[in-house]
């Protein structure tokens, strides 16, 4: 296995975005691609590591730059300043997501007929909005994602959706989970929700502990959600991944 990584520039109109590409050069044939939608901190090392993990599974991993310019905000105010406009204008967000999706499908190592997306926190919302917006995904997986629907009507989708959710997440109350289930059913999705008890926001991020119970790493929920992820990707990609 020879995993190679490199930055990949793409455009959303005049906005330059810098994705992070990871793939195994050992096998020359085009492979399924898993897009990684970053959390509110931007396309950081965590998102890049997830892309590398996808490459290790035999897929192409492509971490999107949904803020543009590879912005990596550090303070809460700076993170909100970048995330807020996209969260408030979901049409703008979908346009940005479509640009990243298109860029990935044009990569020579990618089989554009086998696309999936995963996302964390804000990236979970991005992943769900890809499904809502009708992007051609085989699978879409949200980890402790924001679940609220956009104002615009969602499109029908054949994507298989997995929502990995901490039941005590203050950013996605139980009623929002129920609402999402109804929404995905109306869209025609094959969907599943894995809700983890005694689990809050950011449960996949090692070292996270806000001290007030709102954000905390949970190794059991992290492991269980990752196993569910590998299972779903294996289901939709079959033997198209090297190690699937």
Where are these regions (language model features)?
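N-terminal cap/leader regions of alpha/beta-hydrolase-fold enzymes
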Residues: 1-244
């Amino acid at each position: 296995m020879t995993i190679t990584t490199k930055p990949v520039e793409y455009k959303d109109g005049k906005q330059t975005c810098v994705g992070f590409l990871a793939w195994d050069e050992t096998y020359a044939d085009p492979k399924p691609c898993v897009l990684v939608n970053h959390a509110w901190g931007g396309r950081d090392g965590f998102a890049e590591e997830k892309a590398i993990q996808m490459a290790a599974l035999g897929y192409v991993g492509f971490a999107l730059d949904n803020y543009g310019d590879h912005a990596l905000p550090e303070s809460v105010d700076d993170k909100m300043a970048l995330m807020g406009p996209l969260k408030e204008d979901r049409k703008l967000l979908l346009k940005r997501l479509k640009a990243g999706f298109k860029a990935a499908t044009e990569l020579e190592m990618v089989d554009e007929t086998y696309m999936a997306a995963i996302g964390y926190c804000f990236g979970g919302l991005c992943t769900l909005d890809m499904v809502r917006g009708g992007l051609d995904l085989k699978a879409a997986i949200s980890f402790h994602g924001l679940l609220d629907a956009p104002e615009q009507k969602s499109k029908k989708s054949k994507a298989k959706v997995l929502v990995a959710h901490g039941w005590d997440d203050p950013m996605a109350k139980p009623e929002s989970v129920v609402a999402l289930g109804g929404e995905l059913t109306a869209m025609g999705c094959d969907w599943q929700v894995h809700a983890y008890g005694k689990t809050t926001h950011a449960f996949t991020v090692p070292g996270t502990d806000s001290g007030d119970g709102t954000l905390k790493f949970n190794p059991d929920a992290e492991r269980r959600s990752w196993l569910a992820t590998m299972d779903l990707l294996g289901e939709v990609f079959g033997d198209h991944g090297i190690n699937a």
